[in-house]
Amino acid sequence: MSDFENKNPNNVLGGHKATLHNPNVSEEAKEHSKKVLENAGEAYDESSSGKTTTDDGDKNPGNVAGGYKATLNNPKVSDEAKEHAKKKLDGLE
């Protein structure tokens, strides 16, 4: 029986990642979780805070700009935050 059968694969992988950090889990269970993650193509670094090692941390510039533009148009945002967003947007162009 597959670990993913009739289940959301992301939830299953998240559970296996949590297993690796749980001090109350046996070494046997941790080894099983490592194998499942490896078989699923998830490069997982136990020393990280739950992030896969394939995540390079780059942000989509379009999304970043969109966030700053939204800040400028949000009436609930302070003038100081809007000024910061404007400076950041000017730097992106």
UniProtKB/Swiss-Prot annotation:
Alphabetized UniProt keyword annotations: Conidiation, Differentiation, Repeat, Sporulation
Annotated stretches, region: 2 X 30 AA approximate repeats: 7-89
Chain positions of Sequence repeats: 7-37, 59-89
Compositionally biased spans, kind Basic and acidic residues: 27-37, 77-93
InterPro entries: Conidiation-specific_6 (IPR018824), UPF0654_domain (IPR052670)
GO BP term, pick one: sporulation resulting in formation of a cellular spore
Region of interest (Disordered), residue spans: 1-93
A GO CC annotation given for this chain: cytoplasm
Function: May protect dormant spores from desiccation and play a significant role in the formation or survival of microconidia and ascospores.
Family: Belongs to the UPF0654 (con-6) family.
The protein's name: Conidiation-specific protein 6
Lineage, broadest ranks: Eukaryota, Fungi, Dikarya, Ascomycota, Pezizomycotina
Name of the gene: con-6
